[in-house]
Amino acid sequence: ATRCASCGAEIQASGFLWTRGEKLPHGRIYDCPHCSDSGEHAITDEDIQRIEQLQRSELMHRSRALSKVLGGNIADRETVEAAINIYPVRSLYVLFTLMNKMEGMTLSDQRRELLEAILLSLMYSGNAIWSWPEERERPRLLSIPTQYIEKNLWLEIDQAIRTWTAEVPRVEYTTWPTMPTKNGVCLYPGRMRDLAQAAEGMRIDQVLCVFPRPNQAFWTLCSLWASWLWGREKAGK
């Protein structure tokens, strides 16, 4: 929570703005529902007190995140620590509070999968590789930009629910030689030259020869998220 600079009401900030290497943020972003004040504003003493209180237990939160991935194995410690270090301590606190709550609940498989989907979205949004002002493309490197935004994960929960419940057209996919009945994707497990002969006389709108590879940041984070959600052993399968 933060306070509106205009009316003084306690509201939720959509994010806090940081400079890499600094111990405290320099700004906050919000849309006040009471007086409609919005945009960037300077940080307040009250905001600083809240952050400093959480920073006192930062080592504990990072150790918990690390042990969830490594267990007793220290072989990959340096790589895992580098990935965890791109998360602000407040994000780690929220993520592991929610995961601990979920582990203590009796849930059906379907409900557990839905909660895990929301958590994945929060893990995606909660790291500090999002530059400010925000860029259109997903970050490609596992590094903190000079200016970055720490997103409010409590507000991101609402966005995650909207994302996962959005109605999108279903894309049919098949494996060669079975073709989609309408518009769709057919996977051909072979070489392009063989496909050219096999598909002679057929109408194919587009051919994708090389699948895009996940960038370094996303690939590393996927491994981290899987370990956090399901444990190191299951994540490695």
Predicted features and spans:
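Nucleic-acid modification enzymes, centered on SAM-dependent nucleic-acid methyltransferases
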Residues: 1-203, 212, 216-237
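Hydrophobic beta-strand segment of the Class I
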Residues: 207-208
